[in-house]
Amino acid sequence: MPPNARVSYGAEKYLPREIDNHGIVGNMHTSAMISLDGSVEMMCWPNFDSPSIFARILDARAGHFSITPIEQTSCKQMYEPSTNILHTKFYSERGVLRLLDFFHRPWEDYEPLYPWLIRRVSCIRGTSRIKLECFPALDYARQSHETRVSKITENYYQAEFVPASGDPKYILDCVPSGDQLKIDLELIYPAEHLIEGGGVISYLELEEGQEITFIFRQEGLGPNVDYVTPNLVDKLEDSTKRYWRAWIQQCVYTGRYREFVQRNALTLKLLIYEPTGAVIASPTFSLPEDLGGVRNWDYRFTWIRDSAFTIYALAQLGFRAEAVEYMSFIYHVLKKKNKDGGINIVYSIHGDSQNLEEVELTHLRGYYNSHPVRIGNAAVHHLQLDIYGELMDSIYIYDKKCQPIAYDLWLEVRQICDYVCANWKRPDKSIWEVRGQERNFLYSKIMLWVALDRALRIAFTRSLPCPKHMVWMDTRDEIYEAIMDSGYNMEKGFFAQSFENNDILDASVLVMPLVSFISPTDPRFLSTMDNIMKPLEKDGLMSNGLIFRYNNFVYEDGVGGDEGAFTMVCFWLVEALAMAGCSGYPKLLSTAVSMFEDLVRYSSHLQYYSEECSLSSESLGNSPQAFSSIAAIAAAHILDKALSIFNEI
């Protein structure tokens, strides 16, 4: 299909690209999802959890910002090495066009942040004709606006998008490099049922060496600039390149999978909200886990579980500053514990629980009619006891890899451990956030054991005062024995999903050796892995080399619908196999290598992952997803160590 057929502003039946045919750029405040066609298909503004301005991937009426060749072209997308600057190239017989997308990042501390989406278009061979379309749809396409076009100078145009509420005003700057390139902006008001408030289009012909920059910004946000010069754009691009290259140079991983690990680390960095140090699960919302299905969630918040794993991964790679910032965020969360002494499972990026209520946007069709489209997340009301394990593991790694924790944080840790001791027997919703009945999920019990184990390690290593250390030790051991006694199905030979569902297999138990709960070569665990690796049709969880969380046809989680294989647990299996492989089972190491290499091929063309993957290799769910990149990094790290032990190349 020609690109211009896909991106017409009047296309009521617009067909978005596949989820994995997008790149992402960001500035640690927000991000933009950009398709291989050169279209901004999702962007929330000015923060990750703000309402969307562009969200056409969910509905043709939800706004877009496209820069697309008019001729039939082939296209390729890549990041500039060691940066999060996205290159999209369009190739035709007439010429080659390059589209450069980035958000500015200041390199020097004294530089201000220009919170702009910058899109630079240049013709690098021959001639190219392009079409610009900018049609915002404010507040998830719920608020109308007025579009105005101004001619600032002979060759400088500016479009303004003024919300019905009057504030804030959004600006599109058109900045040509040189006077030879002539531009014009045409004001368009399509039918009301598409984009209420209109937008702008422009047709341009670029010759070799010509360049034009389009900048989307908000009036009053960032430095005050009346109009943008090409020289300023050059400086912002150079500063952004320097920032990303300096950041990734801190990475201490130098193993076999260096490029893969660094790209996923760069992706994780984009998911950090810089003002607070919070880490979001994903910058997108309501991308489906099953095409046409109902499993469509909003992940633009900071889950304690996801963010703790993220900081664990970044700290292991040598990125200490992010761990320090996150620990500051966590300390403030712990200072505001609930009345019962616990904490919430999810917070806003600002550290509170506001604007998290789940709402269905019934006016949006959803990605390929996958509805409802949801914002907010009802999981905020869940009890998910496993979060205390992930939290304590991240604090333990922080204390070990970054800097010793402060005494005031230790006091908060003690209170958390007391809460764990008092509540570990309660059923919960656990890691999969089921919307059915609460259970005594094994994953939660394992992570509650981790919480007490890591706290005890910190106490003994640092000689920190621990008045209830005997209670913690006794409870830790009691949890362990409960898991081994009630969580293992002796007849079928696997660790089960929960104490109640003792005959149901769940891939979350693969975490056991990863958190040092059990030896990777313990017969019970090896038998569990064997069962998980059986085909779905033979009561296992594997299909086409991919692992499902659990069998939806056997276990009803209260959500309904189907889903794809879960990327994170696929990598957990690689880790577990590699650990067993270097502990006396070399064939399992070979299996781990083969599976890892297959999983690398399941990544997007930019080497990051969505939450899930279909059996036909399509990405499903929100993308990029922190969980998936974290697990990919950890698997590469463990596999590299295991291969080094066996001196394999």
Swiss-Prot record:
Record InterPro entries: 6-hairpin_glycosidase_sf, 6hp_glycosidase-like_sf, GH15-like, Trehalase-like_N
Lineage: Eukaryota, Fungi, Dikarya, Ascomycota, Taphrinomycotina
PANTHER family: GLUCAN 1,4-ALPHA-GLUCOSIDASE (PTHR31616:SF0), TREHALASE (PTHR31616)
SUPFAM superfamilies attached to this UniProt entry: Six-hairpin glycosidases (SSF48208)
UniProt keyword Glycosyltransferase, yes or no: no
Signal peptide, first to last residue: none
GO cellular component: cytosol; membrane; nucleus
Protein's name in the database: Uncharacterized protein C4H3.03c
Membrane topology value: Multi-pass membrane protein
One GO MF term attached to the UniProt entry: hydrolase activity, hydrolyzing O-glycosyl compounds
Subcellular locations according to the entry: Membrane
Keyword annotations: Membrane, Transmembrane, Transmembrane helix
Listed transmembrane segments: 265-285, 564-584, 626-646
